[in-house]
Amino acid sequence: MKNKKNYFIKWAFCLLLAGLLSFCLSDSFAGSSEVQAATSNSANKRFTGWKISGGKKYYYKNGKKLTDLHKIGKYYYCFDSNGVMMTGWNRIHNRFRYFGKQTGRMRISQTVNGRKINSKGVWTPVVVLDPGHSAVVASGYEPLGPGSSELKEKDTSGTEGVATHVEEYKLTLDIGLQLRTLLQKRGFKVVMTRTNSNVALSCIDRANVANKAKADAYIRLHVNGSDSPYDNGAMTLCTTRNNPYTTSLYRKNKALSEAVLDSYVAFTGCRKEYIWETDTMTGNNWSKVPTTLIEMGYMSSPTEDYRMQQPSYQKKMVWGIAAGIEKYLTDF
């Protein structure tokens, strides 16, 4: 009986010891996991360096993604609002900069795609704005293109608002001056073919302003007219692939026309017509730089004529054209 009692005491003691051991081990493992998690979180918060996720490159400093322009080591890099490393041409703080397609490093004191980047890593694009027509109309005729025997009028008086009676040359100048101000704020150098309506300029004269400036983009501002009051919307005009005067510029002219038209329509909400490829425009044929002519709307449409005189809508017109120019310059 005594042996049986001792047996039960030993058995109970073993169970108690096993329970205590199990509790200690589980508590120990839990503590170890918590320590590991805390250590991992602490390491992430302190992490500094590059990471690649989903094919996109990021840089972390003390566990946080960098955004904006930063110097890392010997080079400058730029990251968008989500922390993604940027490449190619970008406007950063109203300055155009180029970041290597593979490395993301900002280029300085180099020429990329014919564009000169200064020692501060800045390229200043040149845009020539040509507000169509004038109060003083250039008289006579001029060749359609270099070496052409076909002659066209040097200029015309343009159209007039059917509802507002505002002349085309006034609206194009108004938009041109507003556009100049916006582009200058965004880091562009802007040259105007005219800043008032008291000068007579032929289409060749206007193109030569762009040629002399070696413009990165030549924007000809016009407004359309039609026999029908129902026609409305915007279009752009560029030379054709087989233009005998500026064949080498076709791709750039087309890309500029697409970018400007798409952005203009997106900002204004107007109807998108089309890109008219034509070799009948003297100003386009004589240009030696990327060129587009935008018809911003129809002054023969009472609704569109009135709308284009509203300051709020003019702001959209200006922002749309500016966005198109920038898209062309950064994408092409």
Question: Model-predicted segments: where are they?
Answer:
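Loop/turn elements at helix/coil->beta-strand transitions in domains of secreted/extracellular proteins
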Residues: 124-125, 183-191, 213-218, 270-271, ...
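Active-site histidine-acidic residue metal-binding/catalytic motifs
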Residues: 122-207, 213, 240
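Active-site-adjacent mobile loop/cap segments within catalytic or ligand-binding domains
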Residues: 220-228, 237-240, 272-332
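Solvent-exposed, polar/charged alpha-helical surfaces in well-ordered, non-transmembrane soluble domains
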Residues: 169-185, 208, 212, 254, ...
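Extracellular adhesion/carbohydrate-binding repeat motifs centered on closely spaced tryptophans
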Residues: 7-125
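N-terminal secretory signal peptides that target proteins for export/translocation
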Residues: 1-6
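Active-site-adjacent substrate-binding region
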Residues: 249-277
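Mature extracellular/periplasmic domains of secretome proteins
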Residues: 203-216, 281-287
